[in-house]
A protein has these predicted regions:
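Conserved, mostly hydrophobic/aromatic
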Residues: 175, 192, 228, 256, ...
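Radical SAM/AdoMet-radical enzyme domain recognition
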Residues: 184, 211-212, 216-225, 237-296
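Terminal RNA-binding accessory module
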Residues: 340-429
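Short flexible coil/turn linkers enriched for glycine and charged/polar residues
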Residues: 138-141, 151-152, 250, 260, ...
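Proteins enriched for Cys/Gly/acidic motifs involved in redox and nucleic-acid/cofactor modification
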Residues: 1-200, 209, 239, 250, ...
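Short catalytic-loop micro-motif centered on adjacent basic/acidic residues
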Residues: 73-74, 226-229
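Short, surface-exposed connector motifs at secondary-structure boundaries
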Residues: 2, 67-68, 220-227
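Flexible glycine/acidic-rich beta-alpha junction loops that bind and position SAM and/or redox cofactors
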Residues: 83, 194-203, 235-239, 258-269, ...
Length: 429
């Protein structure tokens, strides 16, 4: 079959799509562009915000429009949390956020019977980590290693615990095995991902933590760079930093989840830290690493957020001096505690997001400017025009005027800020 795939959402979704792609191609199916005619389409959906829900529905409808006779399959968080709504869209195969290994069987069943197949479990009852094969598509330089699934934080705004279930961790021996496989396939960088990787090991009940896993990954990965997914502030302790500093392949890019810079707002969100603890994590990272890229997420206009509270957040993000930020106006998720709170008008949420974005852009440009004159080992991912584009260890994009550097690491001296990235010159080897 010719199959088109579209993925929305986080790196976990990207990883799970990658696993499905491997299974499909290994079984003789052909992957085609999502906009091309196909026998089947797969949409890996997201439900982190209302916009994500809307995009998921749009892509399902687009698939049906692209090839009216094709089988349309959908999986992921939107399907898991909105099963009945998803069924109303006329999807042929509905699977949630589990049993990726059985996806091909279910897809072939839907193609054969032309009847709707629904296979969605109760996420909150899951207790076992689903191990998927390591690897990816041949033209990619960066592989993802999913080490954890699920979340038990139950932030008042978030639906994801209901979509993904409780914490389940990839056993360390399986992680080591997958890292060796990815290394042998020639990947240059490994992204350690999960729904909430700070909780890695929580379910193993043997004292294992994320830093233990990272040491195993570094040992088995050789020269493969290690990049971390989003971290909770509680992870960043002095012990964590002391041990992480000793891992030569760990990229100094730390996405430290924040959401608000106001203690009262954080409490309403049911976040498990205050601004003092958060800032302690930022300072520890800067103590142990040379000008690391500390990045974050921010929700503006959370229920009951006053102008004074938002002002505290603006002052706090200035204090932290982030290298980059992802900023979202608060999105109501039905069924969450925050949905029942007093809502801030959407125009105010968006206006605050714009104000925060202006501060974030100034800080981002300042961080880029500090990179000028430095030399970074850049992993190049693609040609662009007459040059090549890649990322420095701090995840800043770097462009050079040399083609043909795909999947190589080159030392590059940064000569200028280039929009939202950097420009440089490869050093002579």
């Amino acid at each position: 079959m010719k199959i088109g795939i579209y993925t929305l959402g986080c790196k976990v979704n990207q990883y799970e799509t990658q696993a499905m792609e491997q299974e499909l191609t290994a079984s003789g199916h052909e992957l085609v562009d999502f906009e091309s005619p196909a026998d089947a389409y797969i949409i890996n959906t997201c439900s982190v915000t209302a916009v994500s829900d809307k995009k998921s529905r749009q892509m399902i409808r687009r698939a049906k429009k692209n090839s009216p006779d094709a089988v349309v399959a959908a999986c992921g968080c939107y399907v898991q949390t909105h099963e009945e709504e998803a069924k109303s869209l006329g999807i042929d195969l509905l699977m949630g956020t589990n049993d990726r290994a059985r996806f091909l069987d279910r897809l072939e069943e839907a193609v054969k019977t032309r009847e709707t197949v629904a296979d969605i479990d109760d996420a909150l009852r899951r207790r076992t980590f689903e191990v998927l094969p390591a690897g990816g598509m041949a033209n990619r330089t960066r592989a993802m290693l999913k080490v954890e699934d699920g979340c038990v934080n139950f932030c008042t705004y978030c639906i994801i615990p209901y979509a993904r279930g409780p914490v389940r961790s990839l056993p360390m021996d399986k992680a080591a095995e997958q890292v060796r496989a990815l290394r042998s396939q020639g990947y240059r960088e490994l992204v350690v991902t999960g729904i909430e990787i700070s909780s890695y090991g929580h379910d193993l009940k043997d004292g294992t933590t994320l830093i233990d896993l990272l040491e195993i990954i570094a040992r088995e990965g050789g020269e493969m760079r290690i990049r971390l997914g989003s971290l909770e502030p509680r992870t960043v302790t002095r012990e964590f930093c002391e041990r992480a500093k000793k891992l030569p392949t760990l990229c100094p890019h730390f996405h430290l989840s924040m959401q608000s810079g106001c203690d009262a707002t954080l409490k309403r969100m049911n976040r498990k830290y205050d601004t003092a603890r958060y800032y302690e994590s930022v300072e520890l990272l800067r103590e142990y690493f040379d000008d690391p890229a500390v990045t974050t997420d921010l929700i503006t206009g959370f229920p009951e957020e006053t102008e004074e509270e938002f002002g505290e957040t603006l002052a706090f993000i200035e204090k932290c001096g982030f290298a980059a930020m992802h900023i979202f106006p608060y999105s109501v998720r039905p069924g969450t505690k925050a949905a029942a709170m007093a809502q801030v008008d959407m125009s105010v949420r968006e206006e605050r997001a714009a104000r925060a974005a202006a501060v974030a852009e100034r800080m981002h440009q300042g961080y880029l400017a500090r990179c000028v004159g430095k030399t970074f080992p850049v992993l190049f991912e693609q040609d662009r025009g007459e040059g090549s584009v890649g990322h420095a260890p701090n995840y800043m994009p770097v462009t050079v005027d040399v083609k043909g550097l795909h999947n190589t690491v080159q030392n590059v001296r940064i000569t200028a800020v280039d929009g939202d990235g950097l420009r440089g010159e490869p050093e002579e080897t």
